[in-house]
């Protein structure tokens, strides 16, 4: 197992695609983010590389995926803040300020399935998507519309759809 700080640096870089964003979001200096992601990658026997302005991993991620599931379970139990990808909706009153108990981030890759990829890899816990641009339905995903004046909704893993902390977030956001 690795510390929350080490895994946050590695996963934050893969999620947000910017060391500066990771540092700001997880309150780490950018050099600390770099050092931590390297240590974390080394523990799992993988490497990070940048190709066409996108951070990716190289190597067998089996142990890393198991570790991510453990960390996500801890977040869902309230042991640390949950993560939500908001796809550039920072100006929305729903996310400024961030909901209590949540880390709000927006990757540099809005136009591709990056947020859903991070979501499926257990890097983030919820992904906000415009209802006009939702991922194709699959058996493991649930789409929860927010029914606000702006048409957007959350994509969550079906197994987490009724999880207490996620339900609380959705209830709170529907009140805004």
Regions found by a protein language model. Give the residues of each.
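Ligand-binding "clamshell"
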Residues: 46-47, 135-154
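A bilobed periplasmic-binding-protein/Venus flytrap-type ligand-binding module shared by bacterial periplasmic
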Residues: 151-165
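Short acidic, S/G/P-rich loop/turn micro-motifs used as interaction or catalytic elements
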Residues: 89-92, 111, 132-137, 160-162
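Hydrophobic beta-strand segments of well-ordered beta-sheets in folded domains
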Residues: 80-84, 124-126, 154
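Bilobed periplasmic-binding protein/Venus flytrap-like ligand-binding cleft at the lobe interface
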Residues: 33, 165-176
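Short beta-strand/turn micro-motifs composed of small residues
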Residues: 86, 129, 156-158
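Short helices/loops that flank or line small-molecule/ion binding pockets
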Residues: 25, 110-127, 131-135
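N-terminal hydrophobic or amphipathic helices and topogenic motifs
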Residues: 1-110
């Amino acid at each position: 197992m690795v510390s929350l700080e080490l895994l946050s640096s590695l996963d934050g870089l893969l999620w947000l695609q910017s060391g500066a964003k990771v540092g700001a979001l997880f309150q780490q200096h950018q050099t600390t983010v770099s050092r931590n992601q390297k240590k974390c990658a080394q523990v799992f026997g993988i490497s990070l590389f940048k190709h066409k302005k996108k951070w990716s991993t190289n190597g067998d991620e089996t142990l890393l995926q198991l570790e991510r599931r453990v960390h996500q379970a801890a977040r869902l139990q309230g042991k640390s803040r949950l993560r939500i990808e908001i796809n550039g909706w920072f100006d929305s009153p729903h996310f400024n300020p961030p909901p209590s108990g949540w880390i709000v981030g927006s990757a540099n890759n809005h136009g591709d399935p990056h947020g859903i990829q991070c979501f499926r890899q257990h890097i983030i816990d919820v992904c906000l998507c415009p209802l006009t641009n939702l991922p194709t339905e699959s058996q493991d995903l649930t789409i929860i519309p927010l029914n606000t004046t702006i048409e957007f909704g959350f994509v969550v893993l079906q197994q987490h759809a009724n999880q207490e902390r996620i339900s609380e977030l959705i209830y709170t956001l529907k009140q805004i």
